[in-house]
C-alpha cells in the first residue's frame, strides 16, 4: 500500500494496476487504460485472483479504472513466469491479491474525492479481538457532467452528444478468528456500470454491465501444526444492451462460475490440493 501512495493518482483515484506498471517487465499503454502488458504479451492474458479465486473482471466497462481498491486489496503476489501448477489457462501472468483483514481493535476510514468519482472506506471490529471487516463503496459522477452538457446542446439534431457513463463498485472483506484452531474469511466485489448514448434525435442506446466475485474460506489447524484449508468461490458477469429507434434492438449475456478448493499442508514443502 505504501508503494501505491507514492505514485500519481490518475483522475484522483489510486489504482493497483497503475502501480504494477511501475515494476520491471510490466507496462501500460496510456494513463486511461487500466490494462497491463507483461513482457510484451496481451492484456487479456493476465489472471487476477483473490485468495487464489479468479475475479470476474479486473476493470470497469470503459476501462478508465480497475475495480480493485487498494484500501482493501493492499497485498499481492505477482507471477510473471514459473507459475505454480495450480494456475492454468492464462499465458502472461497471475496476480494473486489478499484482502486486508481489517482492524480488530478500532475503527478507521477515509473519504476520497476524485475528478470522476468519490469513495467511502471503513474498517474496524465487528466483534472486538475476534472478527473484523473492511469495506469500500465508490460511485462516479461522470453521468451528471455528461447530462448537463447534453442539455446545453442547442441543436438536438446534431450528433455531438456526450455518452452518459456511470460506474459503481463495492468491496467487502471479513476476517474472523473463531478459536485458536479455526479461522474464517469472506470476500466480495460487486460492480455496476451503465452507459447511455444518444446517437441522434431518434436513436438511443443503453448498455448495462454487472459483475460479482466472491469467496469464503475456512482454515483448521490441528494440534500437530498441519493446516486444512477449505474455500468456495463464485463469480458472475451480466451484460445487457438495448437500442430504441426506428428498429428496436437488444441482447444480453450471463456467465456464472463456481469452484471449490481443499488444501492440506503438512509442511512448507508438502502441500496437497483438490479443485472442484
What are these regions (language model features)?
Residues 1-83, 94, 100, 117:
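Periplasmic N-terminal accessory/gating domains of Gram-negative outer-membrane beta-barrel systems
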Residues 16, 34, 91-93, 107-109, ...:
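Hydrophobic, lipid-facing positions within transmembrane beta-strands of outer-membrane proteins
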Residues 63-66, 74-85, 93-124, 132-139, ...:
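Short strand-turn segments of transmembrane beta-barrel domains in outer membranes
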Residues 116-139, 156-194, 206-228:
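Transmembrane beta-barrel wall of Gram-negative outer-membrane proteins
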Residues 146-152, 187-191, 195-204, 233, ...:
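Outer-membrane beta-barrel translocator domains and adjoining extracellular loop/strand segments
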Amino acid at each position: 500500500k505504501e508503494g501505491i501512495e507514492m505514485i500519481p493518482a490518475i483522475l484522483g483515484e489510486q489504482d493497483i494496476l497503475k502501480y504494477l506498471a511501475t515494476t520491471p517487465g510490466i507496462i501500460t499503454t496510456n494513463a486511461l487504460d487500466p490494462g497491463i502488458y507483461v513482457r510484451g504479451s496481451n492484456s487479456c492474458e493476465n489472471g487476477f485472483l483473490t485468495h487464489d479465486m479468479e475475479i470476474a473482471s479486473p476493470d470497469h466497462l470503459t476501462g478508465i479504472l480497475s475495480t480493485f481498491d487498494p484500501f482493501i486489496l493492499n497485498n499481492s503476489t505477482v507471477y510473471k513466469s514459473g507459475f505454480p501448477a495450480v494456475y492454468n489457462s492464462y499465458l502472461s501472468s497471475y496476480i494473486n491479491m489478499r484482502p486486508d483483514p481489517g482492524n480488530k481493535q478500532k475503527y478507521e476510514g477515509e473519504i476520497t474525492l476524485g475528478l470522476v468519482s468519490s469513495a467511502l472506506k471503513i474498517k474496524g471490529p465487528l466483534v472486538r479481538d475476534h472478527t473484523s471487516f473492511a469495506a469500500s463503496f465508490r460511485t462516479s459522477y461522470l453521468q451528471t457532467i455528461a447530462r448537463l452538457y447534453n442539455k446545453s446542446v442547442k441543436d438536438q439534431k446534431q450528433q455531438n452528444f456526450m455518452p452518459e457513463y456511470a460506474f459503481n463498485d463495492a468491496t467487502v472483506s471479513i476476517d474472523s478468528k473463531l478459536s485458536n484452531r479455526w479461522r474464517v474469511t469472506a470476500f466480495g466485489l460487486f460492480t455496476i456500470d451503465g452507459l447511455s448514448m444518444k446517437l441522434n434525435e431518434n436513436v438511443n442506446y443503453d448498455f448495462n454491465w454487472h459483475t460479482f466475485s466472491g469467496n469464503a474460506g475456512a482454515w483448521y489447524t490441528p494440534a500437530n501444526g498441519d493446516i486444512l484449508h477449505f474455500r468456495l468461490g463464485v463469480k458472475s458477469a451480466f451484460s445487457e444492451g438495448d437500442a430504441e429507434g426506428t428498429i428496436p434492438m437488444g441482447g444480453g449475456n450471463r456467465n456464472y462460475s463456481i469452484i471449490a478448493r481443499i488444501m492440506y499442508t503438512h509442511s512448507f514443502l508438502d502441500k496437497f490440493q483438490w479443485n472442484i
